[in-house]
């Protein structure tokens, strides 16, 4: 399929090396510090008798608990566990207790929400996000074992100050599923909170190739399509630490910029990096003439999943094949020479599935000092072993790592002292790209819909 988006010109050896600055004095292997690590996940069941009963009944199987996202609020570190048979709780916080596999998890807000048989609780928490009003948003796929639909997908909202469950929003079937292919799978979200009553939630459908937008002002949903959401068959095969697997997944990792209101995203099976400005969505404008998708098809040298944007407009992306974190300052043009690798570790960064940037933390687990600068959290889950089902649970398999954002990008391309001027130039360039590609974009979108 011909793609309509402009591509970054890049040839030969210069292209291959553009994502990392040569002769850098930085030790990329030590850029991110390990905060927590696990051989496998276990839970605070309250008693050993309760734990053994869960094992005997099949409620808990330590070989089936795989993490997918992380976030932090005050002294609570949240970890989501994909719901497989043998997973007792999908939304959790890290407790102060330690088991043989690592720190024990504790269901959030309590064990009652771990039960899901009547569909009133959480089936499988894929991604989570905390907004500026201390609300926790949880994307519940409704799937067990990643493929079996048990309940309709939902959004859950919690008040973190009280741990009260504020709202449960069921996502309509015609929104959650591609009407042509019958496929659907919600795996990622980003939250844009203008105020308490005016919040937009963006969700990625990686199987149905769509972006879903929820507006809490009127409880409305919108399903958007673009060929930039589609997976690229050239990049469906991925290799991590010498182990390969295939995933034909479309749009997955997303991150919202607090500077430009750009929503950045990539299909998992691609080397692309794309974005859409959300200003029209904030005005309830969802028509094709209002929405413009931009980016580059082959700007990365590997696949990417997790993403996050700092308060100064630095986009961080997890680089799958490199076991690394890359960065780009959105005040610069989107070209390979402006991307740089800021962390790389073949052992600790095998598939970065979750990534968050926290502006300030009054308390941080692992440190006696408050974090007053922006701080990055990443979760790595060795996805190649999830897909291939070949974990060795005597090894450390899952990690949460962190770093000060300023220190992470110090002396890199991602630091820019003239951001205000450059952001205007970048926006002007983007406007020109939108105008030049508008006609071709509409044609290609129609072709894509016909292909589906």
From Swiss-Prot:
Gene3D superfamilies: TolB, C-terminal domain. N-linked core structure contains mannose (which consists of 8-alpha-mannosyl residues, one beta-mannosyl residue, and chitobiose). Keywords: Glycoprotein, Secreted, Signal. Optimum pH for protein stability is 4.5. Protein becomes unstable at pH above 10.0. Residues 416-452 are annotated as: Disordered. Induction: Moderately down-regulated by the ecdysteroid 20-hydroxyecdysone (ecdysterone or 20E). SUPFAM superfamilies: NHL repeat. Residues 1-17 form the signal peptide. The keyword Secreted applies. It is found in: Secreted. GO terms for cellular component: extracellular region. Glycans are attached at residues 145, 178. Belongs to the major royal jelly protein family. This is Major royal jelly protein 2. It comes from Apis mellifera. The gene is Mrjp2.
């Amino acid at each position: 399929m011909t793609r309509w988006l402009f591509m970054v010109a890049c040839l030969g050896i210069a292209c291959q090396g553009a994502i990392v600055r040569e002769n850098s004095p930085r030790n990329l292997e030590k850029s991110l510090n390990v905060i927590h690590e696990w051989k496998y996940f276990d839970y605070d069941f309250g008693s050993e008798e309760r734990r053994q009963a869960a094992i005997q009944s099949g409620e808990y199987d330590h070989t089936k608990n795989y993490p997918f996202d992380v976030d932090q609020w005050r002294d609570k570190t949240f970890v989501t566990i994909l719901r497989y048979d043998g997973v007792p709780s999908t939304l959790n916080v890290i407790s102060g207790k330690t088991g043989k596999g690592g720190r024990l998890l504790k269901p959030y807000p309590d064990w009652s929400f771990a039960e899901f048989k009547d569909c009133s609780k959480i089936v499988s928490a894929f991604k989570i996000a905390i907004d500026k009003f201390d609300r926790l948003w949880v994307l519940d796929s409704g799937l067990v074992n990643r493929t079996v639909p048990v309940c309709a997908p939902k959004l859950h909202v919690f008040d973190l100050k009280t741990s009260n469950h504020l709202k449960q929003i069921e996502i309509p079937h015609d929104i959650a599923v591609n009407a042509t292919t019958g496929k659907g799978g919600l795996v990622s979200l980003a939250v844009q909170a203008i105020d308490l009553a005016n919040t937009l939630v963006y969700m990625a459908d990686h199987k149905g190739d769509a972006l879903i937008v929820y507006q809490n002002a009127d409880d409305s949903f919108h399903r958007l399509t673009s060929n930039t959401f589609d997976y690229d068959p050239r990049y469906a095969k991925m290799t991590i630490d010498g182990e390969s697997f295939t995933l034909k997944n479309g749009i997955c990792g997303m991150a919202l910029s607090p500077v430009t209101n750009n929503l950045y995203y990539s299909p998992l099976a691609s080397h692309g990096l794309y974005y859409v400005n959300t200003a029209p969505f904030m005005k309830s404008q969802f028509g094709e003439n209002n929405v413009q998708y931009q980016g580059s098809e082959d700007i990365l040298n590997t696949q990417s999943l997790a993403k996050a944007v700092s308060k100064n407009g630095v986009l961080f992306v997890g680089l799958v094949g490199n076991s690394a974190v890359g960065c780009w300052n959105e005040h610069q043009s989107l070209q390979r020479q402006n991307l740089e690798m800021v962390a790389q570790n073949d052992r600790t960064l095998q598939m970065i599935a979750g990534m968050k940037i926290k502006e300030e933390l009054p308390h941080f687990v692992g440190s006696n000092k408050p974090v007053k600068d922006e701080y990055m959290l990443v979760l790595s889950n060795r996805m190649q072993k999830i897909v291939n089902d070949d974990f060795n649970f005597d090894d450390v398999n899952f990690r949460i790592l962190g770093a000060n954002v300023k220190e992470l990008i110090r002396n890199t391309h991602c630091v820019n002292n003239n951001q205000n001027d450059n952001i205007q130039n970048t926006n002007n360039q983007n406007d020109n790209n939108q105008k030049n590609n508008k006609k071709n974009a509409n044609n290609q979108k129609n072709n894509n819909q016909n292909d589906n």
